[in-house]
């Protein structure tokens, strides 16, 4: 732009400063001190790292395996190898007790890089035990890395920074899905698959050591040794029952509708190009914008209002697809439903992640957060597995309406869950790092 319409250096600096301030205001971080804003960069890096292996598992491998002649049933069955994401709580104490969490991230990501680099050396068409073991290693390392990243982030981010941090966190994760997932599939059109996996492995290796750019966070020795007491005191009372039920049910509607969105587009007669452009690419962009906006909302109005208001918006958005199915609203109606669902999905995700972070004790976050994330991820895998049966039996419109109803029980639990929320953000202060 400067080449066509030259700007004075002073005006250029003012323009850049205004854009930067707009971004901070959008996040609700305009009053945060500079050290707090630097933490947001660390959070963005870590969650880009966290989302990268998932992009290979969800976006790249299904395409690769299908091109190798693997059946749809077998590809679907491979989702069972993702169970480590739901079981990671059982080995999270190891991450909590031993070593620097940054080095856990480095080690896991380096192992993931090796696993991805080995993929083209195995005959995927046979779907033999060697490939299954390699994929299980990949998912286990990815799940373990999640434990380290989530724990580190809870310790890094102060209460006043949680809204903005979770907006950045959800957005960076989605950007990784686009860059490493969609980008890899795009490159597969011009590169051989073995080169593509080697390139991805190289990127993963670089990302592994980039984690050391994050500041070192020390856990007190007493917190490391007494992790079990910290967990049982936190969860071992009757007031924990509403918390667990809330985590189980808050994203039920999202988990139920997700697997059926793309098949619905197909059955509406939309082209592959439209599906790739609108609900996939544009949808992820909108979810990133929604996550950032959700972080700004939470920074201003607090986590309780966030999970209530933003969660309800996310639930209501499922009805958009129901109306399209019931009343045959055509292409524009379908596009509108997609825009609403994608943006509000980002809003609800930012609120939920902020809630999970807030209810954990910072000194015992490794096990506590791993427990909560295991609970809701298990719910997602179970409800997703039967979503096709539900849509087939009652029809798309009724099923999408049912996903809205499934979202509602969580909100009835909010009066009991509210007591778990720590001091609401006041947009001041920051955690100490060394």
Language-model features: locations:
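Juxtamembrane intracellular "pre-TM" segments in multi-pass secondary transporters
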Residues: 22-37, 216-244
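Helix-loop boundary and gating motifs at the non-cytosolic
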Residues: 30-82, 241-246, 250, 254-264
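Transmembrane alpha-helices of Major Facilitator/SLC transporters
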Residues: 84-88, 278-299, 310, 317
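Helix-to-loop junctions at the C-terminal end of transmembrane segments
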Residues: 87-100, 289-303, 391-392
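Cytoplasmic membrane-interface "Motif A"-like loop-to-helix N-cap segments
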Residues: 97-109, 300-312
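C-terminal ends and interior cores of transmembrane alpha-helices
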Residues: 106, 110-125, 313-329
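Symmetry-related core transmembrane helices of the 12-TM Major Facilitator Superfamily/SLC fold
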Residues: 113, 195-212, 400-416
């Amino acid at each position: 732009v400067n080449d066509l319409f030259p700007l004075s250096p002073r005006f250029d600096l003012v323009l850049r400063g205004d854009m930067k301030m707009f971004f901070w205001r959008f996040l609700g971080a305009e009053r945060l001190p500079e050290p707090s804003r630097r933490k947001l960069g660390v959070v963005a890096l870590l969650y880009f790292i966290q989302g990268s292996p998932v992009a290979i598992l969800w976006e790249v491998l299904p395409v690769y395996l299908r091109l190798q002649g693997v059946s749809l049933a077998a590809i679907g069955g491979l989702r069972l190898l993702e169970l480590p994401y739901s079981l990671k709580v059982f080995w999270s104490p190891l991450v909590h007790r031993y070593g620097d969490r940054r080095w856990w991230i480095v080690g896991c990501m380096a192992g993931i890089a090796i696993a991805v680099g080995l993929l083209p050396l195995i005959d995927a068409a046979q779907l033999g035990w060697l490939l299954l073991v390699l994929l299980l290693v990949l998912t286990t390392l990815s799940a373990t890395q999640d434990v380290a990243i989530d724990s580190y982030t809870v310790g890094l981010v102060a209460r006043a920074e949680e809204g903005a941090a979770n907006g950045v966190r959800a957005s960076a994760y989605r950007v990784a899905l686009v860059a490493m997932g969609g980008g890899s599939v795009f490159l597969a059109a011009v590169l051989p698959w073995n080169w593509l996996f080697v390139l991805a492995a190289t990127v993963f290796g670089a990302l592994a050591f980039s984690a050391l750019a994050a500041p070192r966070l020390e856990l007190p020795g007493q917190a490391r040794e007494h992790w079990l007491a910290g967990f049982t005191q936190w969860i071992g009372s009757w007031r924990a029952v509403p918390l667990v039920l809330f985590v189980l049910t808050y994203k039920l509607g999202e988990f139920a509708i997700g697997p059926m969105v793309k098949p619905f587009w197909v059955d509406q007669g939309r082209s592959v190009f439209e599906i790739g452009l609108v609900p996939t690419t544009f949808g992820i962009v909108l979810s990133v914008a929604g996550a950032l906006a959700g972080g700004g909302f939470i920074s201003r109005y607090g986590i309780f209002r966030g999970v209530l208001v933003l969660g309800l918006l996310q639930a209501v958005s499922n009805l958009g697809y129901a109306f399209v199915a019931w009343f045959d609203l055509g292409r524009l109606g379908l596009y509108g439903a997609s825009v609403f669902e994608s943006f509000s999905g980002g809003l609800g995700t930012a609120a939920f992640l902020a809630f999970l972070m807030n209810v954990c004790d910072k000194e015992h976050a490794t096990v506590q957060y791993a427990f909560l994330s295991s609970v809701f991820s298990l719910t997602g895998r179970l409800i997703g597995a039967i979503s096709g049966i539900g849509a087939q039996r009652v029809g798309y419109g009724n099923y999408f309406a049912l996903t809205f109803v499934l979202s509602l029980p969580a909100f009835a639990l909010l009066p009991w869950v509210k007591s778990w929320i720590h001091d609401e953000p006041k947009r001041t202060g920051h955690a100490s790092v060394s």
